[in-house]
C-alpha cells in the first residue's frame, strides 16, 4: 500500500465496530442493546485485527509498525509522560461532562453499558488486554496512518481526530442518535489535542501511556462491577 493511501484506512474501525456488533447481535438472535455489555471483549478482537492490518500496511511500505508511528526508545522524559497523562485525564473528563450536559442536560451522565458486568475471568483478562491492544491499535491507526501521512497541517490534525472520535460512537453500537452524538462529542476535544500534540512532537510514547491509563481505569471498573455483587446497580443509581 502506498504511503499516500494510508489515510484511507482511517474510517476502518468505525465500519468494523458497527458491523461487528450488528452481526454478533444477529447471530445471537438478540437486540443490539443486549450485546452492548460485551463491548470490551469485542474491542480487543477488533484491536488485534487493526494491529495486524497496520503491521501489514507498514511492511508494504518497507517499514515496521514502530517506524509507522515514529516510536523511538529513549527519547521521552518522564515529565512529558506525566504531563500528557494528566492532560488526557483532564480533557477526557471535561469532554464527557460537556457532552453529558449538551446531550442529556446532565454533566455527570455516563452510559451504564460501558461498565456493565461480564464474566469474571474475561473481565480480569481484559484489564491487561484492553488498554494495551487499544493503545497500539488506535494510536497506530490515527497517528501513524493519519497525522504522519497527511501533508496539510490542519487536515493532518482534524481529519484523524474526527475519525478517532467517530469510532467511539460504535463502541458499543447502539442505534440511538443522542447516544451517538454524546459519544462523539465526549472524545472529540481529546482526540484533537492528541493529534495536535503528536503533529508538533512526533513522539507517540506520552500519548500511548496516557491513553493506556484511561483504558485501564475503564477496564478496572468493569472488573469491579463483575466481581463485587451489587456494585453495578449502586453505580448506576449515583
Show the residue positions of the predicted features:
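Alpha-helical transmembrane segments
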Residues: 15, 45, 81-85, 122, ...
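Short, Lys/Arg-rich, polar N-terminal cytosolic tail immediately upstream
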Residues: 1-6
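Cytoplasmic juxtamembrane interface segments
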Residues: 54-74, 194, 206
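Alpha-helical transmembrane segments in multi-pass membrane proteins
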Residues: 7-64, 111, 116-117
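Juxtamembrane "helix-exit" motif on the non-cytosolic side of transmembrane helices
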Residues: 24-34, 98-106, 169-175
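Transmembrane helix-loop-helix hairpins at the membrane interface
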Residues: 120-238
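Juxtamembrane helix-loop-helix connectors linking adjacent transmembrane helices
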Residues: 33-37, 64-134, 228-238
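Alpha-helical transmembrane segments of multipass membrane proteins
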Residues: 16-25, 46-51, 87-96, 164-167, ...
